[in-house]
Amino acid sequence: MSTLPPGPSGLPVAGSTLSFVRDPFSTYERWAEEYGDIVATNIAGRTFVMVAHPEHIERILVTDQQHYGKGSFQRDQLGDIVGDGLLLSEGEFWHEQRNRLQPEFFREQLTQYATMMVDETRARADNWTSGETITLNSELQHLTLAIMARTLFGFDIEDAEGQFANTARTISERFNLSHVSTYLAAWIPTPRNRRYRRAMNNLDTVIYDVIEARRAQDDSPNDLLATLIAAVDDPETDLTDETLRDEIATVILGGHDTAALAMTYTLTALARHPDAEAEVRAELDEVLGDDDPTVTDLPALPRLDAAVKEAMRLHPPAYTLFRESNRPMKIGEYDVPEGATLTIPQWVVHHDSRWFESPWEYQPDRWTDEFEASLPEYAYFPFCGGKRHCIGMRYGLMETKLVVATLLQRFRFDFQLPELSFAAALTLQPAEPVSVRVTTV
């Protein structure tokens, strides 16, 4: 006899949709508290199973990964945006693309990116005046777009920066889980969907313009875009410009926003915890002095590393991930039907008191070698895990640390909001602009 996971029955037909729309984060927390590590419910007509224990997560992402694909839920939601890019592609095509792109994120290549990251950060900070109030999350989104454009695609995004940032923001807002329209098909002409469609058209225009401009260059850099174009132009492959477009969209939308959020949440957490901030600043002074940070400096900055890790634990930019079972499966003592959508929330696991003492407090000092060795493998997974872990993990961590270090060398950040609140969009977005007053050090 099949034993389904426990969970809320919700309303007739609607199931748990309304409670999830009202407050996804509290809903996740309530499910874990009331029903445990494996919870089944109905959302928007789909069987959803929340899995929130590291042991089960490891089975899904690693041991039994062949039985859990990206699935129809993610493809319905994101297929328009990233097509067959790395985020959604499966099987041999995914494997070939992953192998093709992975060298662009090897350590040797990252070393070349580091100087550009610091240069772009200094250029952005040059626009800030001591004593002024800035919208930190917006500033950092513009910065990470500029960094990504220069390092991976070899172009200066200055002219299209605002358009790109607004487009990315509109697309992310389309997937705010707190809006009923998110669960409607994209072709239904709601105001949000119309804005989304315009943003998608803008995104395609910008991407194809970048491709055309690169092909017209006589002397182009050896970067990710060059690798992609060479693969498309190779007669031995079946790749097309649409494939190229999908991978560029995946990298841009998947990479710049999560990095900007990690930076935002690190800087605001430090601003609200003066003792932790003082420790990081003292470390930067001792190791760097007045020099710019380099990639070779990062191993000598453990307090900076801990500050970033703790911010990504407390406020994980990727707050959940999804999989779909492609056959009936057993998770723990429960049966999961074929076609169930699994939601694996970092939001719940990263705040679990079984793994993290005082889980809702920012405590970077917790990240000792002994503590990390004691953690279950998937108690902390800000970059997903298994063979489909984020391809840009090293790039994103290096970028976040270099940017945070560079900015702390120049400014103090006075957080202007009483506290942070969040919106569940494609990523963990601040519910309102993050205003900070910057003062030169």
How should each PLM-predicted stretch be described?
Residues 1-96, 111-124, 143, 155-159, ...:
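N-terminal membrane-proximal hinge/A-helix region immediately C-terminal to the signal-anchor transmembrane segment
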Residues 5-10, 114, 118, 219-226, ...:
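Cytochrome P450 I-helix active-site segment
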Residues 17-36, 291-332:
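Conserved cytochrome P450 K-helix E-x-x-R motif and the immediately C-terminal K′/meander segment
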Residues 66, 322, 344-371:
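Conserved cytochrome P450 K-helix/beta-meander segment immediately N-terminal to the heme-binding cysteine loop
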Residues 70-75, 93-94, 109-261:
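Cytochrome P450 heme-thiolate monooxygenase catalytic core
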Residues 258-271, 403:
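Short, small-residue alpha-helix embedded
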Residues 274-276, 373-375, 393-429:
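Cytochrome P450 heme-binding "Cys pocket" and the immediately downstream C-terminal segment
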